[in-house]
Amino acid sequence: MSAEGEWSCDANDAVQITIVHPDQQKPKTLSSFHPQFTYPIFGEEERIFGYKGLIIRLRFAAHNLRPHVHVSYDEKFTAVDDAEPVDIIGALKEFLPEEAFSSLPEFESAVQEEDAKEFVPPGKLSHSYSIRGRNYEIWAASLADPQVQLLLNRFQIMVSFYIEAGTPLSTDDPEWTLDRWTVYFVLTAARYEKVEPPTPTASSYSIVGYATTYRWWFYKRDRSENPMPRDGPFPPPELVRPGELPSRLRIAQFLILPPHQGTGHGVNLYNTIHKTCLDDPTIMELTVEDPNESFDVLRDSADYHILRPEFLKHNIQINPDPWSDFSKKTKRVPTSSLLPLKTLNEIRTAYKIEPTQFAHIQEMFLLGQIPLKNRRKGGANMARLLVKKYRDDDPNNRRYYWWRMLTKQRLYKRSRDVLIQLKMSERHKALEDTVTNVEDGYEQLFGFFNEREERLRAQQEEAETSNNRDQRTKRKFTVEDEDDEDESAAAKRPKA
């Protein structure tokens, strides 16, 4: 057992991912980092047996993502019976194209000598933005494009490294299927910056991250019509393209590389995808396929800042006196009197956000509209709330009571099959505890949103300062040029 531990190492530590670009003599490292997961490649325990001092260097050219694998180690275990070293190259071949296993000199020569200066990402430019004085672009292209397939096949191992339970896409499907997919590449765009490239052939682009989306057919029945069967041929003689059918757009993969995380690239990428939905009349909703916790936070932040102005514009808030619309009080939560449901549905449809996510953001916004002193975090008297309920004199206390009731109603509908198996007292306690946890989560998000607002405000001020500085510099150069011309003309004039 001790010998096995001596010859075993952590696969996440052994793999080193490096992004490189050309330099004067040989490729230069732009960034280096380790994977978060390696179990799809090296097994559930994420350990590699059979080597001492193992380093698996996985390099990618910054612009076209050409990969290269280089394995080095101090010692290799000699096979004994069934105990033999892990076949590292064999394991990686399932996740990388054949060109990744060329010799190191061949890879370095390709990076150095390849004329990458004219490289332009495939597809069309969807969005450009600046962060901390650097320029970035987001390009979108169909997966049916051969150049997109080339880039994706080179870089798809990142799905296994960073997206838990993620599956690389198949690029061998029929063209009509591939055409349902869109790939978004996020890249630095140094061609706009006043810096000299490291070599005359170097590209101005460098990978930051990417996302993939696909169209999912949306069945939208017009209930005013009575559907009738047709006797026409099947399949129909005219070509039906997926891009022309009503669809949901689903985000399948979404990745910002570790060196670029936490700086706003994810929000820019998500907002670009969302804008694509708004601009396409055939897309009905934007959905996400199995999001993880970190993506949920990003999505909540983006959607909250998209919807909040609309909620404020329409004065969306909880009606503290819903019973005024009823001749007598009912045992049910009067949702239709508490909220302007028609207006909310119109906002949701206009912004193409799927119902569950919209209800989540709406719930968060309604909590934020209640003053902090009337919420649990601000010291609200919860015992008094349980006694007074909707009869409290303070309308904000009544709003807070109804907010908790609306949230309990949503939670009960979602988990009804589990809750009905509990005793009534246990059911009430479970709902009360869950509402408290939901509220705590929203309060944490409010803090995150405030930090984001401050960061965006600082970035905007920095961009404005940079623009003003550039304008002052241009004006200064113009004045100096005019002065030089005046001095030159004066020097040619005869002296008195």
From Swiss-Prot:
The keyword Ribonucleoprotein does not apply. One of its GO terms (cellular component) is nucleus. Keywords: Acyltransferase, Chromatin regulator, Cytoplasm, DNA damage, DNA repair, Nucleus, Transferase. The active site is at E289 (proton donor/acceptor). One of its GO terms (molecular function) is histone H4 acetyltransferase activity. It catalyses: L-lysyl-[protein] + acetyl-CoA = N(6)-acetyl-L-lysyl-[protein] + CoA + H(+). The record marks W181 as: Interaction with histone H4 N-terminus. Its EC number is 2.3.1.48. GO terms for biological process: DNA repair; subtelomeric heterochromatin formation. Component of the HAT-B complex composed of at least hat1 and hat2. The HAT-B complex binds to histone H4 tail. Catalytic component of the histone acetylase B (HAT-B) complex. Acetylates 'Lys-12' of histone H4 which is required for telomeric silencing. Has intrinsic substrate specificity that modifies lysine in recognition sequence GXGKXG. Involved in DNA double-strand break repair. This is Histone acetyltransferase type B catalytic subunit. It comes from Emericella nidulans (strain FGSC A4 / ATCC 38163 / CBS 112.46 / NRRL 194 / M139). The gene is hat1.
